[in-house]
Design a protein with these regions (language model features):
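Short low-complexity, flexible loop/linker segments enriched in glycine and/or proline
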Residues: 1-8, 85-87, 129-131
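Short glycine-/small-residue-rich flexible loop motifs, especially phosphate/cofactor-binding loops
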Residues: 60, 84, 103
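Glycine-rich phosphate/pyrophosphate-binding beta-alpha loops
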Residues: 100-103, 135
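Structural helix-boundary/capping segments
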Residues: 46-47, 57-60, 65, 107-160
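Short helix-loop capping/hinge segments that flank enzyme active sites or metal/cofactor-binding pockets
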Residues: 4-60, 76, 115-118, 122-125
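Short, acidic Gly/Pro/Ser/Thr-rich loop/turn segments
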Residues: 77-78, 138
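Short, surface-exposed loop/helix-turn segments at secondary-structure junctions
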Residues: 5, 47, 79-100
């Protein structure tokens, strides 16, 4: 669902005459979203939007009873910055974006979110804590992140 919504949104920003002539300039992770969105019919897009609204309603229900959702920043340990994003998690093939499912949830909902350092794995890889607040409550994310970072500051230098 997310790739179709994101792909449709990207189409809004493409100047006429740029697609597909410049498709090779897109990141390999981004291009499938464009290709997928180009094939989505209006009825299918309507179904995707209804699915998004159902997710938004479910998230709104959660924020009726909590101020913050705290989750891992990623679903897996850190991977190389130059990529690619992993295509397998716990032996199961997944869309590359599923390494960051909680960020995707915040993007669908349109809510503020922030990631703060939370320690390291047994192998010394960084682990983040993802904080997500209700819509228009950036102050909640920022205040909590400030408290957490003051309590456990991240080291300023890299270690080997």
């Amino acid at each position: 669902m997310w790739s179709k919504i994101q792909g449709a949104d990207m189409w809004v920003h493409i100047p006429d005459g740029c697609w597909p002539d410049r498709a090779d300039e897109l990141d390999p992770l981004v291009r499938p979203g464009f290709d997928s969105a180009a094939r989505v019919t209006l009825p299918k897009f309507g179904a995707v939007l209804r699915e998004r609204l159902a997710i938004e309603d479910a998230i709104a229900d959660v924020f009726d009873s909590v101020d913050v959702l705290a989750t891992p920043t990623t679903a897996i340990p850190a991977f190389a910055a130059e990529g690619p994003m992993p295509r397998e998690i716990n032996g199961r093939r997944v869309h590359a974006g599923m390494s960051v499912p909680f960020a995707m949830l915040a993007n669908i909902w349109g809510s503020p979110a922030i990631s703060v350092p939370a320690g390291t794995t047994a192998d010394g890889l960084p682990v983040g804590l993802h904080l997500m607040a209700d819509r228009h409550r950036e102050d909640v994310c920022l205040r909590l992140a400030r408290v957490l970072e003051r309590a456990r500051p991240w080291p300023l230098g890299a270690r080997r």
